[in-house]
Amino acid sequence: MKICEEMVKLREELDKRNIAWIDKSDIYPKERIEMLKSKGFTEEQSDLTMYRTHFTYKDHFYSVIFGYGSYGGTNPITSEVSGDKLELMIDDNNPQGWLTAEDVLNIIDKA
């Protein structure tokens, strides 16, 4: 799974604002994906890649994710790629999904 366009946009905007971010992505190895596919799983079921961008802004920690199991990423039940949107974790109990990079920036600016 490739990094989504919205995550790239978000990282570029964070750079423009001089907000330091950390890439905490978990890229699933191609060998593991191929092994799972050889066992009958689809590409979508086999690729459990999760892209994560972590940053602190106005004394709040944020985690933005895209990938397997995220809102806007790959649905873990149907294995369908749902789209090119981001999920913002404000805290463990408050995820917000189906966001563009602009949506994420608007949310953090209002916090």
Predicted feature descriptions by range:
Residues W21-E80:
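Amphipathic, interaction-prone secondary-structure segments
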Residues E6-R11, S82-A111:
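Ampiphathic alpha-helical segments that act as solvent-exposed interaction surfaces
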